[in-house]
């Protein structure tokens, strides 16, 4: 735990192959949290092949050129470590927890999976079957359907964010081990990766263990330049997708967001909390669920990437309340855009966001996550300490201007998934 008021001492090192390393030693702890983020998320997928990045990442955990999937998992279990690999819009992130004494072995296993995956035919087929099964389950899940439809409304087919990270069923069924290897060679590179460690370990030892584990990780040729195409909404787009045998509707209402590197992003995070991030500190969340009882849940999120990740409000609603829940949400947004928001609203949102940071600092995993955003997007060496002050510095005028710039109430994408909506009288 990082004591309240104390400084997170982040120390950095870069390996000759380009891998950037950041470590925050925390005295009094035996455990460590380890995150390896490779900038190989959706934005780095081949055009027209949504799902390849996630498929590749999942297959990387199914055996290496040195040991099969069971042996690799057994070696991880032997040191009491837990690990996973997730893919988002920007990065493929390997996350693990272990004792500080076992970091060397953990990094060696991590390097095996990331640098020398086998992509054995049997294991590739297993990942394919699991992914197809998940996609089939998602086709009956109103939350997943609403998100898929919303992305299709906002992002054109060639855009990397058009599909969910899990991808398109046709792509998953057709992808070959050779395609996964090609994606791995092109995208999984040390010069686009960041290793972050927080917890009970000294920086010098961590740097030495990382050098030993990742020294052979190399890349062919210069890193491919990538950018995310911009998108905009000229008006309101709406689609209802009927999901059989359901009694609840799920709603996604949203807009294209802004890059994490945009100078207005911190103000956008505060604006998101003022608007609908939860039901305690947010205007729409509190009114729609707690005051009017129109939704089972309400929350909003603002994605982080180098492009316009989704900025969405999500709701679970009785079909008879869908239209009113959406209308009330937009009315609350119009109040913010119109300047009808108070300093109390702002202070409550800032208290919630800074409080979440304080909670995150109580665990190695939370500290590592705070560090990772700053390292991946190169937000400055003092990002972890500066960020709470930046949240507090956001003004009411900035919240209003941010809402006007990015959340126009009359230009939005709306996806509704569930049973048919009742016909209005």
Spans of features found by a protein language model:
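Short beta-strands and strand-coil junctions in structured, solvent-facing domains, enriched
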Residues: 41-44, 203-204, 259-262, 320-323
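Residues that act as N-cap/strand-start positions at coil-to-secondary-structure junctions
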Residues: 5-7, 77, 235, 399
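Charge-rich, well-structured scaffold segments of protease-associated domains
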Residues: 14, 22-25, 71-223, 229, ...
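N- or domain-start disorder-to-order transition segments that initiate the globular core
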Residues: 1-31
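Active/ligand-binding-proximal structured segments within catalytic/core domains
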Residues: 18, 25-76, 150, 263-276, ...
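His/Glu-based metal-binding/catalytic segments typifying zinc-dependent metallopeptidases
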Residues: 22-26, 33-40, 222-281, 287
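A generic structural signal for well-ordered coil/turn residues at beta-strand boundaries
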Residues: 9, 32, 90, 235-237, ...
């Amino acid at each position: 735990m990082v004591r309240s008021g104390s400084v997170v001492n982040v120390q950095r090192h870069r390996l000759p192959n380009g891998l950037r390393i950041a470590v925050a030693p925390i005295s009094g702890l035996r455990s460590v949290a380890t995150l390896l983020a490779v900038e190989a998320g959706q934005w780095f997928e081949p055009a027209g092949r949504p799902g390849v990045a996630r498929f590749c990442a999942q297959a990387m955990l199914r055996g290496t050129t040195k040991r099969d999937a069971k042996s690799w998992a057994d070696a991880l279990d032997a040191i009491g470590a837990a690990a996973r690999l997730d893919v988002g819009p920007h990065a493929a992130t390997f996350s693990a927890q272990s004792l500080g004494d076992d970091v060397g072995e953990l990094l060696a296993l991590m390097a095996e999976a990331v640098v020398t995956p086998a992509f054995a035919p049997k294991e590739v087929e297993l990942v394919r079957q699991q992914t197809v099964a998940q996609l089939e389950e998602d086709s009956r899940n109103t939350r997943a359907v609403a998100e898929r439809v919303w992305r299709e409304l906002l992002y054109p087919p060639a855009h990397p964010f058009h599909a969910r990270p899990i991808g398109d069923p046709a792509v998953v069924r057709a992808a070959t081990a050779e395609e996964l290897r090609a994606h791995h060679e092109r995208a999984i590179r040390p010069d686009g990766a960041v290793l972050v460690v927080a917890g009970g370990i000294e920086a010098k030892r961590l740097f030495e263990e990382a050098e030993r584990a990742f020294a052979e990780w190399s890349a062919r040729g210069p890193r491919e330049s990538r950018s995310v195409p911009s998108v905009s909404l000229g008006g309101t787009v709406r689609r209802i997708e009927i999901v059989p045998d359901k009694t609840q509707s799920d709603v996604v209402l949203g807009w294209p967001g802004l890059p994490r590197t945009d100078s207005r992003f911190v103000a956008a995070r505060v604006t998101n909390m003022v608007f609908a991030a939860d039901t305690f500190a947010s205007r729409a969340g509190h009114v729609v669920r707690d005051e009017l009882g129109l939704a089972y849940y309400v929350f909003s999120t603002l994605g982080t990437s180098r492009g316009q990740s989704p900025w969405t409000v999500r709701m679970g609603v009785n079909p008879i309340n869908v239209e009113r829940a959406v209308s009330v949400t937009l009315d609350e947004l119009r109040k913010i855009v119109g300047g009808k928001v108070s300093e109390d609203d702002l202070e409550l949102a800032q208290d919630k966001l800074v409080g979440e940071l304080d909670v995150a600092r109580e665990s190695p995993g939370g500290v590592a996550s705070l560090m990772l955003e700053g390292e991946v997007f190169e937000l400055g060496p003092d990002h972890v300490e500066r960020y709470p002050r930046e949240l507090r510095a956001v003004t009411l005028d900035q919240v209003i201007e941010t809402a006007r710039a990015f959340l126009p109430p009359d230009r939005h994408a709306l996806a509704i998934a569930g049973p048919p909506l009742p016909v209005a009288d």
